[in-house]
């Protein structure tokens, strides 16, 4: 359990810094709720916790850690691309429409994802913490 691990680390004098990588509650979660037939990347059984910026701040404060560096990033727009592509295939729409969708969105993926990352609404975060 994450709380138990943080509690142990808090009292370990050999630990000064901590690096974590956690999945976050992001756009991908909503896409998975709307597309139950498409493979779930965020909500699958391997992830027992999804965090928000607020929940991470709360738990770090509780256990005596402060953020010294963070990198918010994700594949939410790739997930959006995948979910829409799968849905288009299932609707048996024209192949031309599927090709057009793929052509149009590919060049936008990085810019769209960057905006989500800037708002800390992406599917992952890597954080370096310092014990205070």
Language model region names:
Residues 66-70:
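Short, well-structured beta-strand/strand-turn elements
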Residues 33-43, 84-91:
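Short glycine/proline- and charge-enriched loop/turn segments
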Residues 1-35, 48-65, 124-132:
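Conserved SAM-binding loop
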Residues 13, 43, 120-122:
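A generic fold-level signal
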Residues 71-132:
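A C-terminal cap/extension of S-adenosyl-L-methionine-dependent methyltransferases
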Residues 9, 37-39, 116-117:
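Short, flexible, glycine/charge-rich loop motifs used to bind or transfer phosphoryl groups or to couple energy/partner
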Residues 14, 38, 74-76:
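Active/binding-pocket-proximal capping segment
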Residues 44-46, 115:
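Active-site rim elements
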